[in-house]
Amino acid sequence: MIQPSDFHTTDTALVLVDHQVGTITWAGELNTVQRDQLKTYVTFIAKFAKAAGMPIVLTSSLETEAQGLLLPELQTALPDEYAKRVKRDGVINAWDDPNFADAVRATGKKNLLMGGLTTDVCLVPPALSAAKEGFNVIALTDISGACTKRGAENSVSLLHAAGIPTMTVTPMVTSLLGNYKNPASGAFFELMGSLGILTLMQGGDVL
């Protein structure tokens, strides 16, 4: 199995699947506080990746239906990537949409950090497909949420069985840095403070 230490800011892309205003309400395993924390962590990884110069691919599904637009936090943090997002017309496994798969391939990175809403429907299928194609994938569980707690458990089992590790954002970012002398560390520490990540850690976050 690949290890987080194999991923670096210079060889990794961030892929966010269906973090939409309607879809987040379908993450039934999460309560309101946990959904707010998810928004904080997805903003954290998005802003960090942008500051570190990592390629970012966004995709959404059926924006004019109940799923809605991507989270406002992502629209604000990633205006350029939001403008280039892959808007799927109903394809459930994002990897089955050639525009999405080609956008990921076009990053030129073989290491992918992936998160999705919901975990069981929107993250697992494209993560498995990307891994099957030969990408190294790590799934970020605190920017993902399943329809049910059982769905979350099954999702992690499927990912692990396919050799895809699961991580949370903060330790994954420190692993990407490798050394606090990394130039991207400035963004890391600034975001830890400005987004209240340190406060969440000190208070014992619930994700």
Where are these regions (language model features)?
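Short gly/pro/ser/thr-enriched loop/turn and capping motifs at secondary-structure boundaries
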Residues: 93, 120-121, 144-149, 173-175
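Short beta-strands and strand-loop turn motifs
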Residues: 59, 137-142, 168-170
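Internal catalytic-core helix/loop-beta-alpha segment
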Residues: 88-132
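Substrate-gating cap/lid alpha-helix
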Residues: 144-164
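Active-site acidic carboxylates
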Residues: 1-89, 136, 153-160, 177, ...
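Short acidic-hydrophobic, aromatic-tinged amphipathic segments that line or gate anion-handling sites
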Residues: 86-87, 165-171
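A short glycine-rich beta-strand->turn/loop micro-motif centered on a GG-aromatic cluster
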Residues: 113-116, 136-149
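Generic recognition of short, well-ordered alpha-helical segments
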Residues: 69-70, 98-99, 125, 150-154
